[in-house]
Amino acid sequence: MSIPSILRKETLKKKDKNIDLQENNINDLVVSASRVIAPLWPISTFAAHHPWMGLEKQSFEQVANWLKEARNVDIYPSASMIHSAKAKGEIEESFLQIALSRWLDSQSFHMPRETAERFCQEALKLERLPSSLLSSPELNKLAEEINYVNTGSMKDSSMQPISSLIENQNGDNLSDILNYHIIKWCKLYLDDAGASWAMPNREKGFYRAWQHLITFDPSLSKTERKVLKDWPEDALIALTKALSELGISESNMQAYLEGHLLSLPGWAGMIRWRSQQSIEEQELLIEYLAVRLSMELAIVKPYLPLKNQKVEKKVSIVPLIASWIYWGDISIEKWLQMSAAEQSELLAFAYRFDENTRKKLWLEAWEQTHAEQLREKIASKQRATHDKKRVVAQLAFCIDVRSEPFRRHLEKLGPFETFGIAGFFGLPIATTELGSNDSHPSLPVILKPKHQIKELTDENECKSYEQRKMVGSSVRYTFKTMKQNVLTSMLLPEVSGPLLGLQMVTRSFVPRRVGGFIRNLRKNMLQKPDTTFSLNHVHDTNCEIPIGFTKEEKVNYVRQALKMVGLTEGFAPLVVMCGHSSQSTNNPYAAALECGACGGAAGGFNARVFATLCNLPEVREALSAEGIKIPDDTIFAAAEHKTTVDELEWIYVPELSETAQEAFDCIEAIMPNVSQHANRERLMQLPHFKTKIKNPSKEAHRFAEDWSEIRPEWGLARNASFIIGQRELTRDCDLEGRAFLHNYDWKQDESGDILANIIAGPGTVAQWINLQYYASTVAPHYYGSGNKTTQTVTAGLGVMQGNASDLLPGLPWQSVMQSDRETYHSPLRLLIVIQAPTKYIERLLNNNFTFREKVQNKWVRLASVDPEGRWKNW
C-alpha cells in the first residue's frame, strides 16, 4: 500500500524539480509537516500533551496504520497487555465478539461466513505464527508459485530520510550518525541551564550559530566540511537547496520533511515549542530542518545518486498463506487445489485482518467493558436512596483523578459536599510570587494569561525576605560556579564533601526525618511574611498583560466558576477552594505530578486568589444583584491538597464567622482520619505494598522525602474517564482514582455554553493527559522516556538516555508499569460521560466541530446519562 503523507495538501501540484520553489511554498510545507510532531514543553513546566494532537483530522485507526508503516511504531496495546487485561477481568469476551461481527459486516468477501469467522477467531488469540512454518521450504515454494496475487499493498520509502537507507563501510547507518550530530547541536543551542561556555552567536539564531561553527567541527570529515563551507547564510534558501541536491521532488517534499521530524520527535518537538514562544524564534523549525538536511547532504553526498532510491515492493505473501494454514486449517495441498481467484480472495482477507485490525478489536472490547462496568457502578448508586444530610462545609477540588479518593473519604467521614472544577478555577493569570521577578502562566497550556497577579507585602518585610532568599541563592550560585569552573571544580569535593556525605547518609537511611528537618529549617530561615495580592487593575507599561482585574472582571470570573460547578445557591458556612500540589525529592518529573490545569505548577496560588475574590464585598454585592446570593456568614478559604501524602494544607484562612469556624474545626478534626484512609488506598496500589500498612501517612511521607524513591506516587496513571455532572451521580461510587470529575448542572445551562467551555478547556486537558499516558504505555521506546534510574537531565530542558539520545517526550517507565512484565496503566482512550438530556449532547456535537471530529475519529469516547438515568453511547 503506497502511504502518502497523511497531511499532504490536496492542492499541491507536481512541478518540474528544476523549477525553484518560492519561499512561502517551503514555509507552508514545513507548517503542514510539523503537525506530525507535538510541541514538547521543558520538563520544569511539564505540560501534559498527546503526541498526535496535529493528526486528529484522521481517524485513530488511520494514524495507527500510518505509524506502523512509516516508523514501525505500534500504538495499539500489545498482545501481552491484552492477555493480562483479559485475565484480570477487564475485557469481556462478548464485547470482542460484537466488535468482530461488526467488522465482518463491514467487509466484502466471497467465502462462507463460517470460514471467515473461524479464521478470525483463531487469529484473535494473538499467537505468533511459528517461525518453523514461516521458514518452511514447502510454504516458500508455494508463495513463489502464486506470487502473481496482488494484495494491493506496496511499500513506499519516500517517507524515509535518504540517510536511513545507507550504511557506511563500518556497517553504521548514516541516519544514526546524522542524529548524533543533530542532538549535539540542539543541546548546544537550546541549553537553558546556564552553561559556562554558551554557544557562540546564539543570539543570531540556530542556523547562523551552527553555520559559524560547523566548518570547524572535528567530528566531520574534510569532505563533509567542504560541502558546508560555502553553504547559504539564509536557512530557508539552505533548506531549499538541500532538498534539491538530495533529489527530493516537490510532490514528496512534505513527506520527506515529516520523516526527518519523526526521526527525533523529542528534539523536534522542543524546537517547535520554542518557535511558538517568541517572535524572534518563530522560524526556528525551519532553521532546525535546514541544519538537519544540510548535514544530511554533507554526510550522504559521496553515496549519491542512490540506485533505486524509491523502491516499491509487494508485501510478502508468505505470512498471509501461513496465517491461513495455522489459523484457517487450510493445508498446502488445499492451496494448490484452489483457483487463482480463490487464492487471491483468501490472501486479501488475511491482509485486511492484519495485526493492527485484531488489536483494534481487542482495544474496542476493552474500552466497551470499562464503559459497561462504569455504567453499572453509577446505576447501582443511583438506585440506592440517600438521606440528605446537613452540609457544614463545601470543598472544591481540581478534576485531577487523584482528588477522587480523597473526596470520597472526606464525604464519607464528615458532613461535607465536594465539587470538581479545573484547578486554575477559571482564572487566566500569570503568577509572580513574593521576592521573584519571574512570572509563571498558571493556567492550562492551551490558554494564554490575560492578567498578572503579584504577591505583595509590606515594603520593609519584602526587602528583609528578599535578603534572606538571596543568602540561599548565593550559596547555590557559588556552588554551581565552582562546579563549572575548571580550577575550582577540583577543590569543590574537598570543601563540600563532608557536608554532602553526611546529607547522603542521612537522606538515605532516615529520609522522612531529615527531609522534614530540612523543610522546616528552610521555612524558618525564610520566614515568609503574610502576603496579599495585586487584585486591582493597574496598567504597567513594563508588563505585556495588565496587573490585576477590573471590578467587572472580578465579578465575571467568580460568577463563571460558580455557575460552571452549579454552586449558585445553598452555600455552606465555609467554602474551601482546594488547589493541589505534589511533594517529592530528587525528581526531574516533579512538575508532571503538579496541577496540569496550572501549567505544571501547584494550584494553591489560584485557589487563594479565587477565594479572596469571593470574599470581596464589591463582588458579593454585584453577584447578589444577579441572583447569586452568598450569605454574610459564608466565608471562602483556600487550601492545597498534597497528593503525595494526601493532606490538606491551609494557605488562606480569613477571619471566620462562628458557623464557619465550627466547620473549619470539623474539617481539622477528621482530616488525619481522611489522610490515613486515602493514603492506605493509594499505597496499596504501589508495587512494594501488598500487605497491611500499619501507618499509611508515615509511609507516604517517607516516599515523599526519600531521594532514592523512583515512584513517590502513581500520578494520573489508570485515568480512563471524565465525568461531567452533579456530584449525586457519582457520590459513594468507588471510582478507584480513575475518573476526572467535573461538576455540571445542565438545568443552569440552557444555552449549552457552560458545557461547551468544559469540553473545550478541562475536557481537552483531560484528553491530552489520557493520551500521553496511553502513548507512554503502548510505545514506551518511542513516546515514553525509559527508566528513571538511567536518565540524564540535559540542558535544563528534559531527559535523555545517556548523552546522545532523543529528548524523551513522554512519561518514564515507573509512571505506567507495575513491573518489567506488567503494566499498571490501562491504555484506554478517554471516556467522556456527560449528565444532560440527549438534546444537549446533540447540540454540543452540532456546534463544536473539533469535538465532533475527535469523537467520530475515535480519539475520545462519548457517553451520556439523561435525567432519568438512561445511559447512551455515542
UniProtKB/Swiss-Prot annotation:
Report the membrane topology from the UniProt record: Peripheral membrane protein
Q: How does it assemble?
A: Forms a complex with DabB.
Q: Does the keyword Cell membrane apply?
A: yes
What cofactor(s) does the depicted protein rely on? Answer: Zn(2+)
- Protein's job: Part of an energy-coupled inorganic carbon pump.
Ordered alphabetically, the record's keywords are: Cell membrane, Membrane, Metal-binding, Transport, Zinc
Annotated Zn(2+) binding lies at: 398, 400, 580, 595
Task: Please provide, alphabetically and separated by semicolons, the GO molecular function terms listed in this UniProt record.
Answer: zinc ion binding
Q: Which InterPro entries match?
A: DabA (IPR018752)
Pfam families in UniProt? DabA (PF10070)
Coiled-coil positions:
none
Q: Which HAMAP family match?
A: DabA (MF_01871)
Name the record gives this protein: Probable inorganic carbon transporter subunit DabA
- What is the primary gene name for this protein? dabA
Primary subcellular site in the record, as a coarse category: membrane
- Give the signal peptide as a residue range, or say none if absent: none
Q: Where in the cell is it found?
A: Cell membrane
Q: Which family does it belong to?
A: Belongs to the inorganic carbon transporter (TC 9.A.2) DabA family.
Keyword Hydrolase among record annotations = no
**GO CC field:** plasma membrane
